[in-house]
Curated annotation (Swiss-Prot):
The chain crosses the membrane at residues 11-31, 57-77, 94-114, 116-136. Keywords: Cell membrane, Membrane, Transmembrane, Transmembrane helix, Transport. This is Multidrug resistance efflux pump SepA. The gene is sepA. InterPro entries: SepA (IPR031396). It comes from the Bacteria. One of its GO terms (cellular component) is plasma membrane.
């Protein structure tokens, strides 16, 4: 009976994670679909890859996932440098944010975007999109150095 209770609790927690993850991915998909429609409407982008549903999912999904990993790696690397060099003026304040934004944008463009031949988005549009994401990050997470209250 004890194991049945643990199994039931595990299934409930797992179902909550699966349902919330599915809702998040659905909203992310609708948001990216809306963004792509806006970019196409204003002739700022062209998405020429149009195969089957799963092929499109893998092609465009890998573009998004690689972009996210690029952002994640640069953010963590810059935070690591900030912790190792706390007195350096380049790793403080607005200069730090501008360096992080510039490195992220350039690496995304030259490592990820340039290899996807069916996605045609101008560099300045990518700069604008990533810039809006960084501004939202600073608005909603203004002091990102200690979000989890960890004292190290």
């Amino acid at each position: 009976m004890k194991y049945l209770r643990y199994l039931l609790t595990t299934l409930i927690v797992l179902s909550v994670f699966i349902i919330s993850g599915a809702i998040f991915l659905t909203f992310l998909g609708f948001g990216l679909y809306g963004l792509s429609r806006i970019l196409i409407y204003f002739h700022l982008a062209y998405f020429g890859y149009n195969k089957s549903f799963y092929d499109n999912l893998i092609y465009y999904g890998s573009y998004i996932v690689l972009g996210y990993f690029n952002l994640f790696i640069v953010e963590n690397l810059m935070d690591y440098f900030r912790k190792k060099l706390p007195e350096n003026l380049y790793f403080q304040g607005l200069t730090f944010q501008l360096i992080t934004f510039s490195v992220t944008t350039l690496l995304f463009y030259f490592i990820v975007h340039i290899h996807y031949t069916y996605i045609d988005i101008d560099f300045w549009v990518i700069v604008l999109i990533i810039g809006v994401l960084f501004i939202c990050k600073e608005i909603f997470y203004p002091d990102s150095k200690n979000l989890n209250q960890k004292n190290k």
